[in-house]
Amino acid sequence: MSKFMMPPQATERVARLGQRIRVARIRRGWSVADLANKAGINRNTLTALELGKPGTAVGVCFTVLWALGLDKSLDAVADPDSDLHGKALEASRRPTRASKIRKASDDYDF
């Protein structure tokens, strides 16, 4: 069984997110215990999130952002309207011209 390896770019983003969460907590004057209690998680889990540990569940991350009042910023994450590459791929698979209108068969005309 192979071990999951995150790409370096993803690892960096997880670490930056953890740092941002830590800054937001400190700006509010909250301890790790304060934010962990507000989010309903263990202090060690919050510390792992702030340290950018990739094994921290995405649900925990969303809950912590909610507890900080930063969850509205998640609306832009993977927004289909902002996915220009996906839109281009979808458009390339559409038929380029309309299909011919087929005459109805009179075989079943009573």
Where are the regions a protein language model picked out?
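A short, Lys/Arg-rich alpha-helix, primarily the initiator
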Residues: 2-27
